Amino acid sequence: MSTAVSLPPGQGIYLLIATLPLLVISEFRSTSYVGICLFKMLSSVAFLSGPLLQASTNDSPYCRLITAGLLFSLLGDFFLLPSRGDFSTRDSTKERKISVSFQLGVVAFAAAHIAYVFAFLSDSRETSRELLATTFIATMVLAKWLGVVYPPSHSSASSNALDLAISPDMKPLVFVYALIISSMFAVAVSTVPSSLSTVSPYQRSLGAAMFVASDLFVAKDAFGRSSAPNQRGWFRIAVGYGLYFWGQMVIAGTVGA
C-alpha cells in the first residue's frame, strides 16, 4: 500500500510552482488586472495538463470524470475572474454585488464536485455508508456554524462564525452548493480506491479537504462583511490559493496512479 501523495506527470507541477506565487503577488498588490487573470488561468491549466496528457492512454471512467471535474473547475476559475469594473473598485468600502458571472462560477464548481463524486464512486473497492453519512452530516453542521448555510444577521461563537452576509437571492444557490461539496467530501472520505499499490488511500480525502477549505476563503471574500481585498494580507491570499490549486493537483494526481 502506497502512503506517498502522487502528483500528475508532465510540466504542470513546475508551471504551478512558477505561476502561483506570481498570482499571489498580483492579487495582494492589486495593481495588475492582466496579471491576476493571466496567472490564475495558467495555474488552472497547470492542474489540468497532467490528466489531459494521460487521456490518450487512459480511457477509464475515473480518468474521464476527474478530467471533466478539472475542466469544470477551470471554467469556474474563468467565471470568477473580476471584470475590469470590479477590479477598479475592489478596494471600495461600498457593498459589492454578486455578479451573474460569479453565480455561473458557483454552478461550474458544483458541476466539478458532482464529477468528482461519480469518479470516486466509479473507482471504489468498498464504500462505508456509515462514514459517508457521518461525514456528510458533520460537514453540513460545520457549514451552518461557519455561516455558509442560511446565516443569521449577526455573528456569534455559536453561529455564523465567519460573519457572512449572503443576499437572499444567493442563499438557495449557496445552500445547494454546500450540499454538493459536502457530498463530494463525504464520498472521498468513505470510498477506498481500487488500486492501493500505487496511490495512497487518503489522497482523495486530502485533495477533497483542501478543496473544501479553499472554498471557505472564497466564501469569506465574497460574502464577508469585512472582506475588502485591501484588508487581506498576502498570507491569507497565499493560503487560500495554495489550498485550492494544490488540492486540485492532488486530485489530478489520482488519475493513472
Protein language model annotation of sequence segments:
Residues 1-257:
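Polytopic alpha-helical membrane-helix bundles and their juxtamembrane interface segments
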